[in-house]
Amino acid sequence: MAQRTGLEDPERYLFVDRAVIYNPATQADWTAKKLVWIPSERHGFEAASIKEERGDEVMVELAENGKKAMVNKDDIQKMNPPKFSKVEDMAELTCLNEASVLHNLKDRYYSGLIYTYSGLFCVVINPYKNLPIYSENIIEMYRGKKRHEMPPHIYAISESAYRCMLQDREDQSILCTGESGAGKTENTKKVIQYLAHVASSHKGRKDHNIPGELERQLLQANPILESFGNAKTVKNDNSSRFGKFIRINFDVTGYIVGANIETYLLEKSRAVRQAKDERTFHIFYQLLSGAGEHLKSDLLLEGFNNYRFLSNGYIPIPGQQDKDNFQETMEAMHIMGFSHEEILSMLKVVSSVLQFGNISFKKERNTDQASMPENTVAQKLCHLLGMNVMEFTRAILTPRIKVGRDYVQKAQTKEQADFAVEALAKATYERLFRWLVHRINKALDRTKRQGASFIGILDIAGFEIFELNSFEQLCINYTNEKLQQLFNHTMFILEQEEYQREGIEWNFIDFGLDLQPCIDLIERPANPPGVLALLDEECWFPKATDKTFVEKLVQEQGSHSKFQKPRQLKDKADFCIIHYAGKVDYKADEWLMKNMDPLNDNVATLLHQSSDRFVAELWKDVDRIVGLDQVTGMTETAFGSAYKTKKGMFRTVGQLYKESLTKLMATLRNTNPNFVRCIIPNHEKRAGKLDPHLVLDQLRCNGVLEGIRICRQGFPNRIVFQEFRQRYEILTPNAIPKGFMDGKQACERMIRALELDPNLYRIGQSKIFFRAGVLAHLEEERDLKITDIIIFFQAVCRGYLARKAFAKKQQQLSALKVLQRNCAAYLKLRHWQWWRVFTKVKPLLQVTRQEEELQAKDEELLKVKEKQTKVEGELEEMERKHQQLLEEKNILAEQLQAETELFAEAEEMRARLAAKKQELEEILHDLESRVEEEEERNQILQNEKKKMQAHIQDLEEQLDEEEGARQKLQLEKVTAEAKIKKMEEEILLLEDQNSKFIKEKKLMEDRIAECSSQLAEEEEKAKNLAKIRNKQEVMISDLEERLKKEEKTRQELEKAKRKLDGETTDLQDQIAELQAQIDELKLQLAKKEEELQGALARGDDETLHKNNALKVVRELQAQIAELQEDFESEKASRNKAEKQKRDLSEELEALKTELEDTLDTTAAQQELRTKREQEVAELKKALEEETKNHEAQIQDMRQRHATALEELSEQLEQAKRFKANLEKNKQGLETDNKELACEVKVLQQVKAESEHKRKKLDAQVQELHAKVSEGDRLRVELAEKASKLQNELDNVSTLLEEAEKKGIKFAKDAASLESQLQDTQELLQEETRQKLNLSSRIRQLEEEKNSLQEQQEEEEEARKNLEKQVLALQSQLADTKKKVDDDLGTIESLEEAKKKLLKDAEALSQRLEEKALAYDKLEKTKNRLQQELDDLTVDLDHQRQVASNLEKKQKKFDQLLAEEKSISARYAEERDRAEAEAREKETKALSLARALEEALEAKEEFERQNKQLRADMEDLMSSKDDVGKNVHELEKSKRALEQQVEEMRTQLEELEDELQATEDAKLRLEVNMQAMKAQFERDLQTRDEQNEEKKRLLIKQVRELEAELEDERKQRALAVASKKKMEIDLKDLEAQIEAANKARDEVIKQLRKLQAQMKDYQRELEEARASRDEIFAQSKESEKKLKSLEAEILQLQEELASSERARRHAEQERDELADEITNSASGKSALLDEKRRLEARIAQLEEELEEEQSNMELLNDRFRKTTLQVDTLNAELAAERSAAQKSDNARQQLERQNKELKAKLQELEGAVKSKFKATISALEAKIGQLEEQLEQEAKERAAANKLVRRTEKKLKEIFMQVEDERRHADQYKEQMEKANARMKQLKRQLEEAEEEATRANASRRKLQRELDDATEANEGLSREVSTLKNRLRRGGPISFSSSRSGRRQLHLEGASLELSDDDTESKTSDVNETQPPQSE
């Protein structure tokens, strides 16, 4: 079940097509056939239909082939209705049986649905193919969904566990069990994948440097564990040979914070031998296949066939490459954080395990002793493990064993040696695996404590039932018994909770108890002992064997219900245990050996003492192993060897596993478990095949069928009321009346109508529950009902159709009758003559009517044509308007598009600004943290430097002392040598003692380890208790409100109780007085009447008191009006108080009886007592009546009085607390004030100066802000003007388009070209912005690189200094060593000094290594930044190339646009506006430059102040001679200087910020100017190109015209010459005319011929001219063909000349003709006209040329202006650079001054050290601090200079942030105003509180006085009572003096109350509630 990927639709592997399932035909078929399941050998179960019942047997017909069979009724299992086909939760099946479960799983598996729920289980069947249901899209599909909302999936289980953990704060667990190859490990990986994706910390947090590192490591832990713990078996190519429990810890927010892995039962025997066609662990094959040659030579690796432990050689895994897997394993280890040394050490151990197998022994000839003939393999093994070869060989062949108290060498046999080697190999690999798990846990544990919650994932083998099972199978089956018990118990609990929620009555059965007998059989410790306890017990006995163990087990557990003995002697099994999954036969071969796991302790000791640290770490607990020396001998019994063990030195495998399992179960019980049961479908690893018997066995073993059994005991089928009513209401048609009815009532009526047995159902609050099978029965009845309804419906439909067909036939019959009647009438009339006339005349009547209709149609057609013409006109008008509207719409759309682009650009700018701001803030935070780290590091180095200097001084003093003592010690050397010999002997004795102590120490360490493990368990228990406490706190939080109410009532009851206690004490005192009066009444019986009258008088007084109290009540009513709401609750509390009073009175009666017993002395006293009791009873009645009346009257007053006192006391306590806080704050402030008083004096002056400067700078900043805001406002106005002009221009263009039809086309073309140009310009601007951003980023990276280089240089200097110090110390150390070596043999003190020096040297070397590491880190950072810089350079080159391409494209578009003059005019207007904006920006730049100059001046001022401070520092240094006197002054000046430096730093930062702002503005202006300049250059270039093009065209035209003119001149000259010649000839002809008249006829003939030739010539001439014009036109269209066209023109001109020569020749021949002269004259006039036309054209072109020249001059003027502006900007830039150069010079000067100061300081230190060495040693720390401050100041100055240099680069960013800062400033002002208002309000509240405190104090003092009075009175009364009691005890006479002093005054709130002694103490208790009542 690897990662499922593919292109298929994942939903078909998750969701079921319900349309197929709810097919009515299938439902009807199931109902009709009564389908059931019968057993089948081949298919497990087959579907069949019941045909006939014959007693206990039933005849059935198989559904597949129709065969009939007889089956027992008990073997038949019901089939579920088709609606339950492929159900997602098998608990919903109404027929819960094995056949239905198997059928459902089979159907889903064949449909590709591998996950199915079964109640709490999720059953998974291995598909043996890739399914596309594990992608991240599927994870997102299940994320946040509940279990019932999505189909079954391992992701749904994971999501449910994760959500329950977050919501309920309860730990979760996911338990994956199943056979090997069922997919446990893959599902575990999918769970981890899902949790790592859902709970990843890389989506928002920044806890670690690498986001998502923990999740990545968590996912990479599996490949490592699989390589070392998985192997290929017959069933599974990647079988986990161990169990694991993965705990993933989460914090309170749900993010993963760590993980932990626990492993169980590694199959270590696979490392030494494997079954046929199986492999050992993957890592051996991966190492041998994937290791390189160098690694193979280091690990001494060979071929696969050269290792004995690889039993089957190399067996490849289909579809996998071990070489690739090895690389993946190594990569996973690197990701997990394994070091190279750790990986190499692990691989060495793996290679050593293989080498163990190649060690061979042979048996000696005459003895059984083993020998090693070849030790080559042993040498390789010892080389890999770091052991001595000889010692290893000796330990294997002749180990040293203990016999009694002595050790002897015992020879081993070949079998014993082979066994020892295999045991060592297995133990080595097991320890390596344990170390690997521990190392992975260490990498995954990111917290110092466990997370808030965790999800545990258990991947462990399921039940294993082989033919014969061993000790490992017992452990696995024992584990599964415990897990199944946990499941049964959990399922029982959940069912119980469900039934409780729904209010269902059910007698619950805890099915978890069913498995307890089997578990007790295995784990019970005693009475009788279980299997594991007996096994451990046998391991302790010397001669125990496996056979004795089996005998004891049978003896102890033979009668157990779950234990069986083998039935026959020939059975191979030793005993059987009946597990819940079935009976399992166990063979007890070598169980004692496996339980003890013995090793050769000699070799283990060697491994523990290995020179390889890793191997020694693996074998550190060597004392816990069971040694082979404890095995006394190998007996010949069938069960193995006997053992002799140490006492208490080891713990067996069974004990360890039982403890780990107990711990695991405790963890699981404290979690909410989720169960995943993995099923293997077949053993052939074939997809799509399912073996039913195999699946049934696994379902039985996995507990799925057990869960079904538990479900059947209850009500497994449950359905909500609405669904039940909707589905089954058809069965009870009249049970529910019409109208609305509650769902529960409706279901109850339906159940009553269905007459179901009450035991078959339960009705809950929202659902109705049914026993298994009830819903199937209802489904059958529903199907029968539906069948009846359908049959009735079909009958009705058929009747309706028959009636409809009958009506149709009736209608057809009546129609036939009509047709027959008409045909008969026609047959009668067809021969009648009149009928014939009628048939002929009738059509003629119709013709006349048609003419009239045609005329009407013509008229109608004319009307329609008129309407059509009218409509067409309107349509044309509408189309014209529509066209106009479309044009307007296009205009508006273009405007809207422009606005949208502007908005998008602004939004993009805002986003970039925000991102830039965020980036700058992050950079600032990083830099600040880096600075703090460097400062801390520098401080640490300085401290270390001081310590080293002090240490060096100490060493120098020690060396001086040792030099003096060395001579003395030389004399004592001889005696010391003798002492040394004695000491050496003592050392030997001490070493023996030390070895003993080491052993004892190891024992103690073992005990400590055990205590630590117990402590860990206790911590786990405490954590579980804390979980339970958290869960209870959730419940407590719900009850807090009720608790508060109860607390209030309890407080009120306590108040009433206290009152009643006071009253009780009063009554007790009264009783005491009365009892004291009993003896007195013997003598004073006559005076009782007077006493009674006195009591009556006191009653009168009480009434007076009552009246006074009523007055006080009326006075207090105003104060307690607001407490009237609590009156009713007070009544209730009073009733409770009265009840308590009655209880107390009963207690009082009990006390009275005790007193009576004490007083019962004589019979006379008894009689007197009875009489006195009667009298006392009467007095008591009277007193109780008075008390009741009194209480009834003053009870309300007491309560109100008490509440008022409580409020006052609360106010008093609040005032006290407030006062105490104020006093604490006052004291703290006073101490701070005292500490700061001395500093304030120094700071006030500096503060005033800095405040003045700050105000000045604030004013400058405000001016700059104002200027910036003014510039923004102007920019906005210009933008608005530009938009208005753009709109006007668009309107003009639209008018031109309407006016000129031809211009529309050109305007549209221009608009399209313009949009293209805008796009191109926007692209160019975007590229420009990107270039600027990249350049700024490059500059920033360069700055960071420079800063890092500077830091690196500083670190390098510090490192060099430290190296110098180290060298000096090393040289001193060498000298010290030489001196110490001379006296090494004599003095132990010198050895101690040597050790100290060595430690110091090691510390220094370690520090040096740390510095080297830091240097390497900086170097790596530098390289990384250099790579990033190179990448950015490449990107910049790419962007430049793109920009150049875009510029080329822009030039092409500019050439196309150059033909439109209107567009050029528009550009000219825009250019003018841009020039205006540029001038405004220039003015802004000048103002910002002035502000920059002012800031620089302020900086120079600060530098002057800094120089002054340095001068002061020099004065302080010069006055350092009087160090002792001026220390206090130096400290003051130091603090003042620090304050000044801090203030200067802040001022400098403010200046830097302002300078940054101005620099950014300047950069922004420069960028704008550059952009404008580039725009101007482009415009000028385009105009130049246009002018050059026009100039070329004009020159070409002029040349052509000149050539034509030259031709005309030639023709004119020839014509004149011919004219003259013709005139001469004319004269000759006139003279000879007479002679020529004769030949005229012939001449005329010749003339006609010549005329014909002349026409031909003229036609040829015209064609030549036409071709010449075409050539001219072609030459204008294409410049590239100019030369060829000119050649053609020349050729045509030559042809024209030849034709003209022929024409002239013809003219010469027609001399005599006048017509020829006329024709030539007319030709000349035509040529003159052509000449004049061309001259006019030339003049026009010259005018255009002059106009273009004037435009060119204007452009040149503008270009010169732009050049001047650029020159001014360059001058400003040069000025800024010169200023920066000045600041650099100033910095260098400051550095020189700093160096001079350092030099002076060093000179002063030397002088002072020479003069005052003692004083210097005391003040070195302070001087060092001053040095650090000076260095820090120099660094800060350098940093300030760097920041000044950077201001030019950062100015642009600050200028962009000005607007945000101004907005923030407004917000800060509002917050400050709110804070001021809040401060005023708090002040008022403080004043009011102080007034209330004063008032409370006054009232408190008043109450205190009253309380003191009451206390004194109470004490007086107590004294009187005590005296009376003493007298009563003595039996003396009692004088009633209390009768006269029974009253006193109690003043409260101005009211005077006279209270009797009876009420005094109760009143006192009311006044002071905290004082307990006085009672005896």
Swiss-Prot record:
UniProt similarity note: Belongs to the TRAFAC class myosin-kinesin ATPase superfamily. Myosin family.
PANTHER family attached to this UniProt entry: MYOSIN HEAVY CHAIN, NON-MUSCLE
Record-annotated disulphide pairs: none
UniProt tissue specificity: Isoform 1 is expressed in cerebellum and spinal chord. Isoform 2 is expressed in cerebrum and retina. Isoform 3 is expressed in the cerebrum and to a much lower extent in cerebellum.
Subcellular compartments: Cell projection, Lamellipodium; Cell membrane
Modified residues (Phosphoserine): S1145, S1935, S1937, S1938, S1939, S1952, S1956, S1975
Main location per the UniProt record: other
Residues reported in the UniProt entry to bind ATP: G178, E179, S180, G181, A182, G183, K184, T185
UniProt function note: Cellular myosin that appears to play a role in cytokinesis, cell shape, and specialized functions such as secretion and capping. Involved with LARP6 in the stabilization of type I collagen mRNAs for CO1A1 and CO1A2. During cell spreading, plays an important role in cytoskeleton reorganization, focal contacts formation (in the central part but not the margins of spreading cells), and lamellipodial extension; this function is mechanically antagonized by MYH9. (Microbial infection) Acts as a receptor for herpes simplex virus 1/HHV-1 envelope glycoprotein B.
Residues that bear Omega-N-methylarginine: R18, R1930, R1940
Post-translational modification: Phosphorylated by ABL2.
Disorder this protein is connected to according to its UniProt record: Associated with severe intellectual disability, microcephaly, and feeding difficulties as well as cerebral atrophy.
Residues annotated as domain Myosin N-terminal SH3-like: 31-81
GO biological process terms, semicolon-separated: actin filament-based movement; actomyosin structure organization; adult heart development; aorta development; axon guidance; cardiac muscle cell proliferation; cardiac myofibril assembly; cardiac septum development
Protein name per Swiss-Prot or TrEMBL: Myosin-10
SUPFAM superfamilies: Myosin rod fragments, Myosin S1 fragment, N-terminal domain, P-loop containing nucleoside triphosphate hydrolases
Stored Gene3D superfamilies: 1.10.10.820, 1.10.287.1490, 1.20.5.340, 1.20.5.4820, 1.20.58.530, 6.10.250.2420, Kinesin motor domain, Myosin S1 fragment, N-terminal
Domain comment quoted from the record: The rodlike tail sequence is highly repetitive, showing cycles of a 28-residue repeat pattern composed of 4 heptapeptides, characteristic for alpha-helical coiled coils.
Domain named Myosin motor: residues: 85-783
